[in-house]
Amino acid sequence: MARDRARLGGAALGLAFALLALACATPPSDEELDAQLRAIAAEVKPRGELRVVSINAESRMDAWTKLAEDEVQGKEHGASQQARRLARAFEKANRLRVAVVTGGPYADLNEQTVRSALDLAMEKHQRMAGLTLVFVSPEAPTPELRATVNRAGSLLVHRTPPLPR
């Protein structure tokens, strides 16, 4: 009985340290994330004019804060600055081939930013048939994002970012 408690306590302590290490893992810098996205672009080899747009946050808490701000700003002032920057990368996709590689370490922030950017770009152009969107995120795109990309007539390719070292 005492051995079981000791094993259980040791396992709980190990789990606590693993969770602490995961929570404290620092996200890649903007330069590192940009390099990762360019490496993924080289691997995928999308056709068209290549544009790389990183979606980054200082920490998981910063990502949640940006999501909350985007929701409030979206209702009052339109899309966030990150979404507007990404929407500019989609320009010309209604008539030319454009490959946009975008993403970052936080799935929810990636998803919201890309959906907002697509909505913003589709206000100008109903269809963006020349767009290949390489979505780099820890989680697969949601059905809502897939539907938005399909409505735009664009191609969606998902890749997961490399694990932090």
Please report, for each region that a protein language model flagged, where it lies by residue.
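Hydrophobic transmembrane signal anchors and adjacent membrane-proximal interface regions, especially
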Residues: 7-8, 50-55, 98, 131, ...
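Mature extracytoplasmic domains of secretory-pathway proteins
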Residues: 64-132
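N-terminal, charge-rich interaction modules
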Residues: 24-87
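C-terminal partner/receptor-binding element of secreted or periplasmic proteins
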Residues: 132-165
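Sec-dependent bacterial lipoprotein signal peptides
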Residues: 1-24
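Structural motif
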Residues: 30-32, 54-60, 100-107, 133-139, ...
